[in-house]
Amino acid sequence: MRERTVVITGAGTGIGEACARRLGAEGANLVLIGRRREPLERVAAETGGLVLVGDAASSADWAGFVAATRERFGGIDALLACAGGHGLGSATDTSDDAWQAAMRGNLDTAFHSARACLPSLLERRGSIVLLGSIASLAAGPEVCGYTTAKHALLGLTRSLARDYGPQGVRVNCVCPGWVRTPMADEEMQPLMRHYEESLDAAYARVTAEVPLRRPAQAEEIAALCRFLISDEASILTGATLVADGGSSIVDLPTLAYERMGDTP
């Protein structure tokens, strides 16, 4: 990764932050993009990355991001599109504004990021990783906007991979399950209040039926993102790498048989 220039959206927290720390430790030139300056500056203090504050779903902001990146580093070798997070509520509970926010936060950010970086990526035969979710593959309760947008990321991954593969640009998607991040910690709060339990106990509860019986650490997902933009993954494009501890392989109806031994 030494001297490769990697653009990371959502770089101030969670998986984006973990990617920055991992790649910065390997000598990559980092471009750290997000809405809030303070967390980006904190990450940059450790990694030496270029901090760019703005909206990853804005074409105008991206024009500035790309210009600043070219001025500092000359071009772009990889994009990690980690921004996202909106979209709670069932369809009937989702207002027009909430729907637009879900699409903008989870899908538009990825599209605008890819479109803006592609000219430079084409020059360098670079790669893109879009951060999906287990919600790209399955539907949780009352997360209509988030689930729809994350499903659409798979289509975006495949479309980009099909269109730009002949010019040497690879595009892949990582779909984590539960990952211990500040955003996921917030999602544990209702369980903690309802069951009067700790954060660790809440994570244990949501992963109780996951084959590995635990959430991922952000660093584990960062390692997969690093692999996908490396030369070691040179034949991979259009792929969906599921990193969910095995939750998506569970045949849910058969859990009833496993639980027979739990009944008195």
What are the language-model segments listed below?
Residues 119, 162-166, 234:
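Alpha-helical segment proximal to the catalytic Tyr-Lys
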